[in-house]
């Protein structure tokens, strides 16, 4: 066999040229113990708090407890495949998620991985899940309405863009329905409104049944609202760290729109379950428990999340992120630990009551206990003009109704007040999936406060409202358009609206 020197030297030169001398350095540790979704790891001396670490098999975790001799890591996934002695690698990255318009129309988990079977998400940007909220200087006070499409809320407890409005109530009182209707109400603006008014929606489901989340997504899809929505799901079967992380992940996705001069709305459904997941993690990490066994920083958990909802000023793009956190109470007890915490953080609350729900008053909003601390600055002028008196009348009605149970002979004025109150309460009822545009709400409430319903039987109010809206949509489009464009009831518009309602009231039998 011939040995060709030239050939050998050519091969050697090629090998030397392609020789890579870069050594891959990664800091690794060892699992000391694992169980209940928590791993104690030895050797990750330089790991950062909140850093993502990787276990064998691609399972991720997050370093939360940095102690002198070990690190407490919460595991995002099943801990069955992790055993003592396994090697744990640092990734060098704080937990982040993909953000951007590519996520619209998708259902993702708390780490931003798609779970809807529609293929990978090609997001161009990633953001940390836990960032500092905007300071005082970049903010502006809330002044634009965030229309929910529900008369009881838009008239009495208005929500503005950049506000945090808590939805609180027992189970099965229609809390999720309020968020769903608010999402559906954005459809007309997305279809033919200007870009600057569009509101992108993020729904975070924490600790709910998968079937419930699937139902929510199905309704959004059927009604064409999924195209401007993102759903982040950490269901009841997901590990506690995922349930803890989901609201932060959803918030980061909403902040992308806020920081790019657009508007976003995020519903956290619900934060009670996030607090329970956080309590579970904290106790397993051996952090000292406080009231109701929650850790001492559970207030900070919710405050740092909700403070990220803000209205930014014009120099910072004038974007906004509105938050609708949900809290589930037990037996209408709003003085428990988590409800009082979140009430004190938010700018108002919508209080839903089981009794009202079973009486058929839906949405079951208790108008007396619900408040919006932003108030009428989050309403258009037309709504302020008509809804100003309805609040007072309903408050008087509630007071009188309590007395009227005892006395049978009531004077005419009291009787009139009770009649009006019963009809206004009926007027504020609304079936699910039928949000109304603001101008339609203004017209209906105008009819209510100006005595058009007083002579009707209570059970005719709903029919009158339907007929009036149908008549306005077909024969008096100019009135509705006028209210939409002017955003106020001018004398001319008021006269036209009055004439339209008069004409309909005459024909209504």
UniProtKB/Swiss-Prot annotation:
Listed GO CC annotations: plasma membrane; proton-transporting ATP synthase complex
Sites where the protein binds ATP: 169-176
Compartments where found: Cell inner membrane
Domain of life: Bacteria
Membrane topology field: Peripheral membrane protein
Record gene name: atpA
Main location: membrane
EC number: 7.1.2.2
Organism expressing this protein natively: Brucella abortus (strain 2308)
Protein name, UniProt field: ATP synthase subunit alpha
